[in-house]
Amino acid sequence: TLEEEYPVSGFGRGLKLKAKRVKGDGTVSRVTRSPGEVLLEYNSIAGAARGIGAALAKIECKESTPFKTLGIMLDVSRNMVMTVDHLKMWFRRLALSGYNMIMLYTEDTYELPDEPFFGHLRGAYTLEEIRELDEYAKCLGIELVGCIQTLGHLEQIIKWGGAYDKVRDTASVLLVDEPKTYALIEKMIAFWSEALGSRRIHIGMDETHDLGRGRFLDKFGYESGFELFNRHLGKVNELCKKAGLAPMIWSDMYFRLSNADQNYYDL
C-alpha cells in the first residue's frame, strides 16, 4: 500500500528493514539505524507505519503514547468531495504519522437508496467507494469512522423543497418527532453500518441553535430546546443500537442549551 507513493518494497536494494513486534500500551514505535539496516520495533500497525515514516525521513526515534487512539476528522462536505484516490493519499500520509483513526465528515455527501436529492450535485460517495476506502484504511492500521449529521447542518438537503419539506424544522435543522425524519436517519445509519467495519459512528448534532423555532413551533408550539434535543438524541441512539453501532456526538449544545444565554460559560 505504501509502495504506491514511497520507496518501500519487499524486493528493494536499499536499506534492509527489520521489524520486531513488542508489547506496550498505546502506540509504540522505535527506530534504530545501523550500517545497511534499520530496526523497527512496534506494537501495532500504526506504530509500524509511524516507524516507517521515521525511517524514510532518515531519523531514529523512540516513541510511545499514553492513549490508544490518535485520530483526525477529514471534512468532505465542502463543495464537491475529495476523490477516492486523493483520500487514499491522505490515508497513507496519516499512517506514516502514526494515526490509527480517521473520521469522514459527510453531511450529505454519500448516496442513500430512494433519496435522489441526498448528495445531489455534490459528488456523493457510493456504498462501494466507502467500502473500498475502509479496506484500504484497514491495511494501514486505520479505523475509518463515519461522522454524519442527524439533526442540524443539513441545509444541503433541506434546500431541495418538496423532497424534504416534511422533515424540515428550520433551514438547516430536521423536524423532531416527525416519523419521516427518523426513517431518513435510519437510512443514514444503515449506510454506515453496512459500509464500514467500525462499530462506532459520530452522529453530529452540533450548532442546532434554532432547534424547535421553525415548523416545529408552528405545528406544536414552544418547547425548550433542551427537551427536544434530549428526546431526539434518545431516538437516534435507539436507531444506532438497532444497527449495532455505538454513537458519539459533539458536546456543544448541552453547554448552550443549559445556559440561560446559550453561551458556553457563565461569566
Language-model features: where?
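Acidic, contiguous N-terminal accessory segments
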Residues: 1-63, 249-267
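Feature activates predominantly on carbohydrate-active enzymes
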Residues: 34-248
